[in-house]
Amino acid sequence: ISRATNSAAELASGDFIAFFDNDDVLTADALAEVALYVNENPETDFLYSDDDKINELGERFAPQFKPDWSPELLLSYMYFSHLSVVRRELFNDIGGIRVGYEGSQDYDFALRATEKARHVGHIPKILYHWRVLPGSTAQSGDAKPESINAGLCAVEDAISRRNINAIVEQPEWAKDGGLGI
């Protein structure tokens, strides 16, 4: 996924790169909302929106209304998820998506990008419908166990870069609930 995302980013021609999965659905106004936000907040380097889930019948459920930017919360879990948008210059400056974090490559990227971003923005609207398929992380955070380990590594790297002395672990309640970190 990391290499494919980086290859796709090389082909893109705009000032911003939006990340979304091929089987998910953007709202009709998603890109317009992103453009409006960036025009009103020109220092924005990283941007995310609220989202919900969509099943095979097209029924939407489980809306995720996210808080505004919180660096402390992002160290706790990947609350950005979908829709995420980054300024191309920042994407290139930090080396894009790192290989070796598959399953949590987006989390690792978000941690690194927000460390360097001038402004991290939140559009408090559902702009993304995350498709729930059997065996996907949209259905369960423990559907892909390797994503947990990759997420732990991403946070360990982040606290090391920030010179924070801490132990990174997945809480028991998250393990028991089938959640990520």
Residue ranges and their predicted role:
Residues 25, 29-61, 133:
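Conserved donor NDP-sugar-binding/catalytic core segment of glycosyltransferases
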Residues 56-79, 92:
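Short, flexible, basic/aromatic active-site loop/helix in glycosyltransferases
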Residues 95-111, 146:
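Donor nucleotide-sugar recognition loop
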Residues 17:
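Short aromatic/hydrophobic "clamp" motif used to bind/position activated sugar donors
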Residues 13-14, 80-95, 132:
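Conserved nucleotide-sugar donor-binding
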Residues 46, 55, 85-86, 103-104, ...:
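Conserved active-site beta-strand element of glycosyltransferases/polysaccharide synthases
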Residues 99-101, 111-130, 135, 154-175, ...:
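Catalytic donor-sugar/metal-binding loop of nucleotide-sugar-dependent glycosyltransferases
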Residues 1-12:
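Glycine-rich, basic loop-to-helix element that forms the pyrophosphate-binding segment
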